[in-house]
A protein has these predicted regions:
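Active-site-proximal beta-strand/loop segments in catalytic clefts of secreted hydrolases
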Residues: 50-52, 77-78, 103-104, 140-144, ...
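C-terminal domain-boundary segment and adjacent tail
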Residues: 19-22, 30-42, 68-70, 83, ...
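A short acidic, amphipathic alpha-helical/loop segment
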Residues: 61-62, 87-91, 150-153, 207-211
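Conserved, mostly hydrophobic/aromatic
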Residues: 51, 66, 99-102, 124, ...
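Hydrophobic membrane-insertion alpha-helices, especially the h-region
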Residues: 2-17
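Active-site beta->alpha N-cap acidic-glycine motif
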Residues: 21-112, 116-127, 132, 136, ...
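Alpha-helical scaffold elements lining the catalytic groove of polysaccharide deacetylases
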Residues: 56-58, 107-135, 145-191, 203-207
Length: 247
């Protein structure tokens, strides 16, 4: 009886945490683990990424704007957000967007022990899997706070830690024009850029249509993280730019 219970427990735990199929990557630069900030790509591609942690009042409009412009993006969700707004999570997945792990409770991962980091990731991973059937593979730590333990723990769970080289700063609530200017005038904006936005920021949905149009006017093709990132055989430079090993 006890053996049966233990076996079932191990099966359940195994279902929660997923392992990478192939580990042939290096996020270590000069002895320090780094998140992916951008991607070396021949084509002028970029990704819009949204963080979803608190409110959901703008998510419907954001998804409609993306659909109207035939754009797919990436949404990083917390476990708490998933529990509160399951229908929005389903809409994200049904819309063809990537969905990523943003922890369970939006705590600062750097301040947590390894076991606590694992718990934060596992809870959200399982919640999304049960709701949508999706196995998430991208992780963005809350507050942009990371260290070697955070990145390596995520990697052990099959996750690529992804930040972004362009921060819209939309959370400062300076207005739609400021968001647009901040992104479009950033000197780091280039092919392979990962753009950070917050779904609950006050002016994000207002800025989004013009942001999409401006990026496309500059020749960018907006894609998902799954379409942009290398899943294996890559390394990072000192800026966290993902470069395939054959270059």
């Amino acid at each position: 009886c006890c053996l049966f219970v233990v076996s079932v427990f191990l099966l359940v735990v195994g279902a929660v945490w997923h392992l990478p199929e192939i580990v042939t990557v290096s996020n270590n630069v000069y002895g320090k683990e780094l998140p992916i900030q951008s991607v070396e790509t021949e084509e002028k591609k970029a990704v819009l990424t949204f963080e979803c942690a608190w409110d959901h009042s703008s998510i419907k409009d954001i998804l409609e704007i993306l659909e109207d412009h035939n754009v797919r993006a990436a949404f990083f969700v917390t476990g708490d957000w998933v529990k509160q707004y399951p229908e929005d999570v389903r809409r994200i997945v049904q819309g063809g967007h990537d969905i990523g792990n943003h922890s369970a409770t939006h705590r600062n991962m750097v301040q947590l022990e390894k076991e606590e980091i694992e718990k934060e990731l596992k809870e959200t991973h399982q919640a999304v899997k049960e709701l949508t059937g999706k196995e998430m593979k991208f992780f963005r730590p809350p507050y942009g706070a990371f260290n070697d333990t955070v990145i390596l723990t995520a990697k052990e769970g099959g996750y690529l830690t992804v930040m972004g080289n362009i921060d819209s700063m939309d959370w400062k609530d300076y207005g739609a024009k400021t968001i647009l200017r901040t992104v479009m005038e950033d000197k780091e904006l280039q092919g392979g850029s990962i753009i950070r936005l917050n779904s609950e920021a006050k002016y994000t949905k207002e800025a989004l249509p013009k942001l999409i149009e401006s990026l496309e006017r500059e020749g960018f093709r907006l894609v998902t993280l799954s379409q942009l990132l290398y899943q294996e055989a890559y390394h990072l430079d000192v800026k966290g730019r993902q470069i395939p090993d054959d270059r």
